[in-house]
From Swiss-Prot:
<dbReference type="GO" id="GO:0048038">
    <property type="term" value="F:quinone binding"/>
</dbReference>
<dbReference type="Pfam" id="PF01179">
    <property type="entry name" value="Cu_amine_oxid"/>
</dbReference>
<feature type="propeptide">
    <location>
        <begin position="1"/>
        <end position="9"/>
    </location>
</feature>
<keyword id="KW-0560">Oxidoreductase</keyword>
<protein>
    <recommendedName>
        <fullName>Copper methylamine oxidase</fullName>
        <ecNumber>1.4.3.21</ecNumber>
    </recommendedName>
</protein>
<feature type="active site" description="Proton acceptor">
    <location>
        <position position="301"/>
    </location>
</feature>
<feature type="region of interest" description="Disordered">
    <location>
        <begin position="629"/>
        <end position="648"/>
    </location>
</feature>
<dbReference type="GO" id="GO:0009308">
    <property type="term" value="P:amine metabolic process"/>
</dbReference>
<feature type="binding site">
    <location>
        <position position="584"/>
    </location>
    <ligand>
        <name>Mn(2+)</name>
    </ligand>
</feature>
<dbReference type="Pfam" id="PF21994">
    <property type="entry name" value="AGAO-like_N2"/>
</dbReference>
<feature type="modified residue" description="2',4',5'-topaquinone">
    <location>
        <position position="385"/>
    </location>
</feature>
<feature type="binding site">
    <location>
        <position position="446"/>
    </location>
    <ligand>
        <name>Mn(2+)</name>
    </ligand>
</feature>
<keyword id="KW-0479">Metal-binding</keyword>
<keyword id="KW-1015">Disulfide bond</keyword>
<dbReference type="Pfam" id="PF02728">
    <property type="entry name" value="Cu_amine_oxidN3"/>
</dbReference>
<comment type="similarity">
    <text>Belongs to the copper/topaquinone oxidase family.</text>
</comment>
<comment type="subunit">
    <text>Homodimer.</text>
</comment>
Length: 648
C-alpha cells in the first residue's frame, strides 16, 4: 500500500463522523506495521475512527482523518494505544499501557482458544476419563476470567466452559460438562491450567429447537405482509438520515456497535439539537449461583468482548420487515486484516398503533392519527445469548432505547433429582440454568437546544396543606454536582429525571427539557463487597451525570477485562464532583433484567424487552404532531379506506 495515497484512504468518506472505511482501516494498519508495530508478535484489537472534537465539528473547520488503534504485543505481554494520521501517514501517538491492562478479546482469539483446548493432551486425557473421546463433538466456549483476587498481571487469559453434542446440530447447552474449566493464555499460546473437579454426570436429555427436531410447523397463521408501495419515508445520504422531523448520523464501532450522532428535531423549520452522541456504553451479566463454575460468570459483553464485532449480518424478512436500509460495519481481525459485517445495522419504519385520538360525543365526530416509528437496530450474538439493540424515534419527539434479549440460556449440570435453589431445573436429567441479571448502561451526550444543560430529579410529593388527602405534586430538585447526581430509581415516588436548558425557554417561560422515564431500573443484586460489584459499580446506581470529558467513554472504564475496578469508570470520574449545572454534560442510565429463569425459556428463549424512554417535557409549545394527515390505510384493492379495512 502507498502510504501517501490520501485520495485512496478517503474513499467513501463524506463527513468527519463517518466510520472508517475498509481502505482507511487497511491504511492505518499498514502505517503501524511500517512503524512501531512491525514485529510479528503484535495483534490488533481495534482500529476505529478517532472522532473530531466537538468544538471542531461545531466550527466546521477541516479536520484530519485519524484512527485510534489498540494493540497487544504478545512477546512483551503488553498493550498499546496508537493515534494514526491517515492523511499524513504518520503515527502521532504511541502509548504503552500499564502492565495490568488487558484490552477486549478478538473473534479469532476465541477460535484460537477453542482450537488449543481441543488439542491439549491434558484436556484430552481428562475428558477421556469422563468417557468423552470424540473431540469433534466437544464444544469449548471461551469466557473472560474476570477478577477474583488473583495475580494475573501480564497474562491474557480466557477460561473455556465445556459442553458436548450428541451430533453435529445438537444443542451443546443441553449437555454441560460441569466442574471442568480450561484456562488458556493468549500471550503464551498455551493451556496454563485445567480445573477438573467433582464429576457430575453430563445431562443426556436433548434441548433442540431446529425444525428437523421439533417436527412440522403450524399452518394456521395467515400471511402478514408489510407493504410500502411508495417506499420508505426516510432519506439517506451516506451515513446521514432524515425522517419526518428527525435527522441524525449513523455510526458503528467495534466496542459499541450502533452509534447515533447529532440527533436533531426540526421544529417550526428549525433543526433543534437533542443528543450529540448516544450508544451502549457497557453491559454486564452477573450470575447468582454459588456453584464453583457458575459463581465466576460475569461477562462484560461490551468491554471484554467488543460487542460491535459480534453483530450479525441481518436479513430481510427475519430480522427486519418492510422497506429496509442497511449499513455495513467495518472492523479488523487480530492480524490487521480489515473485514466487513454486511448489513450490520438495519433501519426501517414500523406502524405504532394510535398516536392520538378524540371522539367528540357532542358533534359525533372523531379524529385519529396513527403513530409510526423509525427503527435503527443491530443484533449481536455473544456465545449463547442474542441481544438485539434498538433505537426508536417517534413522530412526537420521543426516543426509546430497547434491548430484546433472546438466544439460549447459559446452563449448568447438577445431580439428577437435585433442585438447585439458585436456578431453575430444565428437565429431570440434571440440567438447570442459574439465576442471573442483564445490566446495561447507555451513554447520552446531551445537547438540548445547545451545549449548556442541567439535570433535575422529579419526585411526587404530598403538600402540607392537603385537607382532602388527595393532593400530590411533582417537585423538581436540581442536581448540582456529579456526586449529587448518583441516583437510584424510586417507583414509590414516581421518579424521573429531566434534562433541561435554562437558556432556552418555552411558551410559558420554563426551560425546555426532555425527561428520562426510568423503566427497568434495577440495580446489581450482588453484595457491594463482591468482586463483580467493585468492577461493575456503574450498575449499583441507575443515574450518573458527568461533566463532558472525551476520554470518559465507557461506564466500567476503558479496559474492564481482568480489571479490579479500582482505577477507572464512572465511580472514579465522579469523585471529582464537578459542576453539572449549565454546562456540557453526559447522562448515563443503567437498567436491566432480573432473570429468574422459567421452563418456557428453554430450549430457546422467547424475546424479553428491556429499555427506557426519553420524552419531550416542555421542549415544544404544544403537541408537535397536529400536522399529521388523517389516518387511512390502503385496502388490498388499492383503494383508500378510512382508518382500516373491515369485514361487515
Amino acid at each position: 500500500m502507498t502510504l501517501n495515497a490520501e485520495s485512496e484512504a478517503l474513499v467513501g468518506v463524506s463527513h468527519p463522523l463517518d466510520p472508517l472505511s475498509r481502505v482507511e482501516i487497511a491504511r492505518a494498519v499498514a502505517i503501524l506495521k511500517e512503524g512501531p508495530a512491525a514485529a510479528e508478535s503484535f495483534r490488533f484489537i481495534s482500529v476505529e475512527l478517532r472522532e473530531p472534537s466537538k468544538d471542531d465539528l461545531r466550527a466546521g473547520v477541516a479536520v484530519a482523518r485519524e484512527a485510534d488503534a489498540v494493540l497487544v504485543d504478545r512477546a512483551q505481554a503488553r498493550s498499546f494505544e496508537a493515534v494514526v494520521d491517515l492523511e499524513a501517514g504518520t503515527v502521532d501517538s504511541w502509548k504503552l499501557l500499564a502492565e495490568n491492562i488487558q484490552p477486549p478479546f478478538m473473534l479469532d482469539e476465541f477460535a484460537e482458544c477453542e482450537d488449543a483446548c481441543r488439542k491439549d493432551p491434558e484436556v484430552i486425557a481428562a475428558l477421556a476419563k469422563r468417557g468423552l473421546t470424540n473431540l469433534d463433538l466437544v464444544c469449548f466456549e471461551p469466557w473472560s476470567v474476570g477478577y477474583f483476587g488473583e495475580d494475573n498481571e501480564g497474562r491474557r487469559l480466557m477460561r473455556a466452559l465445556v459442553f458436548v453434542r450428541d451430533e453435529a446440530d445438537d444443542s451443546p447447552y443441553a449437555h454441560p460438562i460441569e466442574n471442568f474449566i480450561v484456562f488458556y493464555d493468549l500471550n503464551a499460546g498455551k493451556v496454563v491450567r485445567l480445573e477438573d473437579d467433582q464429576a457430575i454426570p453430563v445431562p443426556s436429555a436433548r434441548g433442540n429447537y431446529l425444525p428437523k427436531y421439533v417436527g412440522e410447523a403450524r399452518t394456521d397463521l395467515k400471511p402478514l405482509n408489510i407493504t410500502q408501495p411508495e417506499g420508505a419515508s426516510f432519506t439517506v445520504t451516506g451515513n446521514h438520515v432524515t425522517w419526518a422531523d428527525w435527522s441524525f448520523r449513523v455510526g458503528f464501532t467495534p466496542r459499541e456497535g450502533l452509534v447515533l450522532h447529532q440527533l436533531k428535531f426540526k421544529d417550526q423549520g428549525v433543526d433543534r439539537p437533542v443528543i450529540n452522541r448516544a450508544s451502549l456504553s457497557e453491559m454486564v451479566v452477573p450470575y447468582g449461583d454459588t456453584a464453583p463454575v457458575q459463581a465466576k460468570k460475569n461477562a462484560f459483553d461490551s468491554g471484554e468482548y467488543n460487542i460491535g464485532n459480534m453483530a450479525n449480518s441481518l436479513t430481510l424478512g427475519c430480522d427486519c420487515l418492510g422497506e429496509i436500509k442497511y449499513f455495513d460495519g467495518h472492523s479488523v481481525d487480530s492480524h490487521g486484516n480489515p473485514w466487513t459485517i454486511e448489513n450490520a445495522i438495519c433501519m426501517h419504519e414500523e406502524d405504532d398503533s394510535i398516536l392520538w385520538k378524540h371522539f367528540d360525543f357532542r358533534e359525533g365526530t372523531a379524529e385519529t392519527r396513527r403513530s409510526r416509528k423509525l427503527v435503527i437496530s443491530f443484533i449481536a450474538t455473544v456465545a449463547n445469548y442474542e441481544y438485539a439493540f434498538y433505537w426508536h424515534l417517534f413522530l412526537d419527539g420521543s426516543i426509546e432505547f430497547l434491548v430484546k434479549a433472546t438466544g439460549i440460556l447459559s446452563t449448568a449440570g447438577q445431580l439428577p433429582g437435585e433442585k438447585n435453589p439458585y436456578g431453575q431445573s430444565l428437565n429431570n436429567d440434571g440440567l438447570y440454568a442459574p439465576i442471573h441479571q442483564h445490566m446495561f448502561n447507555v451513554r447520552m451526550d446531551f445537547e438540548l437546544d445547545g451545549v449548556k444543560n442541567a439535570v433535575y430529579e422529579v419526585d411526587m410529593e404530598y403538600p402540607e396543606h392537603n385537607p382532602t388527602g388527595t393532593a400530590f405534586m411533582a417537585v423538581d430538585r436540581l442536581l448540582e454536582t456529579e456526586q449529587k447526581a448518583i441516583r437510584k430509581t424510586n417507583e414509590a415516588k414516581h421518579r424521573f429525571w429531566k434534562i433541561a436548558n435554562h437558556e432556552s425557554k418555552n411558551l410559558v417561560n420554563e426551560p425546555v427539557a426532555y425527561r428520562l422515564i426510568p423503566t427497568n431500573g434495577i440495580q446489581l443484586a450482588a453484595r457491594d463487597d463482591a468482586y463483580v460489584s467493585k468492577r461493575a459499580q456503574f450498575a449499583r446506581n441507575n443515574l450518573w451525570v458527568t461533566a463532558y470529558d472525551r476520554t470518559e467513554r465507557f461506564a466500567a472504564g476503558e479496559y474492564p477485562n481482568q480489571a479490579t475496578g479500582a482505577d477507572d469508570g464512572l465511580h472514579i470520574w465522579t469523585q471529582k464532583d464537578r459542576n453539572i449545572v449549565d454546562t456540557d454534560l453526559v447522562v448515563w442510565y443503567t437498567f436491566g433484567m432480573h432473570h429468574v429463569v422459567r421452563l418456557e425459556d428453554w430450549p430457546v428463549m422467547p424475546r424479553q424487552n428491556i429499555g427506557f424512554m426519553l420524552e419531550p417535557h416542555g421542549f415544544f409549545n404544544q403537541n408537535p404532531t397536529l400536522n399529521l394527515p388523517t389516518s387511512t390505510s390502503t385496502t388490498q384493492t388499492g383503494e383508500a379506506d378510512t382508518c382500516c379495512h373491515t369485514d361487515k
